[in-house]
Design a protein with these regions (language model features):
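Extreme N-terminal leader/targeting segments of oxidoreductases
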Residues: 1-35, 53-54, 58, 459-461
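Flavin (FAD/FMN) cofactor-binding and adjacent substrate-gating region
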Residues: 2-4, 16, 86-93, 118-132, ...
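Glycine-rich Rossmann-fold phosphate-binding loop(s) that bind the pyrophosphate
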Residues: 39-45, 65
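Glycine-rich FAD pyrophosphate-binding loop
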Residues: 52-75
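Glycine-rich active-site loop/strand segments that organize a redox cofactor
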Residues: 75-108
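Active-site substrate-recognition segment that forms the wall
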Residues: 78-80, 123-129, 219-221, 233-272, ...
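Helical element adjacent to the flavin cofactor pocket in flavoenzyme catalytic cores
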Residues: 152-157, 180-237, 242
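Active-site-proximal substrate-binding core of FAD-dependent oxidoreductases
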Residues: 397-431
Length: 464
């Protein structure tokens, strides 16, 4: 059975040791477990993994509406990254959150890259993980100013000086020979992965540990100790909701909305391409345009290239199976060609996915022992690493342990709600139109600073 998801990652699993097909576990009309986890993405998978390690006798069941890795965890850019700028910037606005807490969060996110790598080695999960670092590039002077600001902010809130380097054009092109690049910020910490291999590898390990996994089993509603599956009911001492961009379908509280990100994947590129453009260290690649791109060089010498495209659908409609429109595909192809000129790329696959965004772009990790209810959500497209950290955090909370993780500023964080429609749609569409105009103005007029109205656009949707 092919996965109901159009991403290259999921569709390529037939060529890997993992299989996206599954035989759902038998679910009786009434089922009982100690812990029920809703959502089969990275948050739910990591949570089941660490909880089973901490409490081997606990009966854990994971419920997924589609198949493991159906959502963003099987569609993302494969960035196991140390970079969480929007989270840091927005947490700084809260007087109750100290700089020391923010620095601790950043250090934990950095350390999580090694944590994930260690688990993959211990559990023999081959997910193409390669630690090549991260390169954010600038292609005009306004973007150089933003890179310098990022550099200063990162050093102030958690990064050590040796972990970051501002690079000139010549220094940058020693990493990747992009002709239009005028500067770059290089991060020592960053790794590319094949996200679907990680998700399905975790699934395989969880089954071996005795975790029950129910795929194609949507949860319609839940309350204390009770899950409603339509034809079945589940009684559980603890219920943990890990549904990210799909959360509003079950929570109906406007805390989180699905924002789409779009990706194209090239066919494998010849050695002559890599001799010309470099990229020998396999760095993650991004830029600091307002409508930014992200990319990776895959193990088999493809380029994954992503951006926002059509970011938000009215009334929080999610990305479905990931069918990407031709206009967005063409926009991404054009931008790819601008960075790597005089190259004809063959596109193997194009898709989109829904990431989860809160009103202030801050994630939240919460657990109430009294209610037996927990929630992980709001990574805003930066969840490949932080979901692992969030899972370890909530396991500490469940086990009653007071640790560095339970002191992180996202613990029990209360996100504001999004506006109702049509105001939500109007605001998001306005933001993206203004950011597109800001990029165009910065290039066209060769501005030395960010376009003045870009800040207004960020404020509209809580990014500034």
């Amino acid at each position: 059975m092919k996965p109901n998801n159009l991403s290259f990652w999921m569709q390529s699993l037939d060529m890997s040791p993992y299989s996206a097909s599954s035989d759902p576990a038998l679910l009786l009309p009434s089922y009982q477990c100690d812990v029920a986890i809703i959502g089969g993405g990275f948050s739910g998978l990591w949570l089941a993994y660490y909880l089973k390690l901490a409490q081997p006798e606990t009966k854990i069941a994971l419920f997924e509406a589609q198949h493991i890795g159906y959502g963003a965890s099987g569609r993302n850019g494969g960035w196991l990254s140390s970079n969480i700028p929007s989270v840091i910037n927005n947490l700084l606005k809260h007087p109750s959150i100290t700089p020391a807490q923010i620095q601790l969060l950043q250090r934990q996110v950095i350390n999580t890259i090694d944590v994930v790598d260690d688990v993959c080695q211990q559990e023999q999960i081959d997910c193409d993980l390669h630690k090549g670092g991260l390169l954010f590039i600038a292609t005009n002077e306004a973007q150089i100013e933003r890179l310098q600001h990022y550099h200063e902010s990162e050093l102030a809130y958690g990064f050590a000086e040796h972990e970051l380097n501002m690079l000139s054009a010549a220094e940058s092109q020693q990493h990747i020979n992009i002709p239009s690049m005028v500067a770059a910020l290089h991060y020592q910490h960053g790794a590319r992965i094949h996200p679907a291999k990680l998700a399905l590898g975790l699934r395989e390990r969880l089954l071996g540990m005795g975790v029950a996994i129910f795929e194609n089993t949507p949860v319609r509603a839940f309350s204390k100790n009770h899950l409603d599956l339509g034809k079945s009911t589940v009684q559980a001492d603890k219920i943990l909701c890990c549904t990210e961009g799909y959360s509003d379908q079950i929570l109906h509280n406007r805390k989180i909305i699905p924002v789409n990100s779009s990706i194209i994947m090239t066919k494998p590129l010849p050695e002559s391409f890599w001799q010309r453009f470099g990229w020998q260290n396999n760095e993650l690649l991004g830029d600091v345009a307002h409508l930014y791109i992200y990319a990776q060089k895959t193990r088999d010498n493809r380029i994954l290239f992503g951006g926002r495209g059509a970011p938000y659908q009215y009334n929080s409609v999610d990305a479905g199976v990931g069918q990407l429109d031709g206009n967005t595909t063409q926009q991404l192809y054009q931008r790819l060609g601008e960075l790597f000129p005089d190259t004809v790329f063959e596109i193997d696959r194009a898709w989109k996915g829904s990431l989860g965004v809160t009103r202030d772009w801050n994630p939240s990790v919460s657990y109430s022992a009294e209610q037996g209810l927990g929630f992980i959500y709001g990574f805003g497209g930066n969840g490949v690493g932080p979901t692992n950290l969030a899972a370890r955090t909530i396991v500490d909370k469940i086990c009653g342990r007071y640790t560095e993780l339970t002191a992180l500023p996202w613990n029990d964080y209360q996100c504001p709600t999004w506006e109702p429609e049509p105001f939500r749609w109007l605001g998001i569409q306005s933001m993206y139109k203004m950011l597109a105009a800001a990029d165009k103005l910065e290039y066209g007029l060769k501005l030395k600073k960010s376009a003045f109205f870009a800040g207004t656009a960020y404020k509209i949707c809580g990014l500034d």
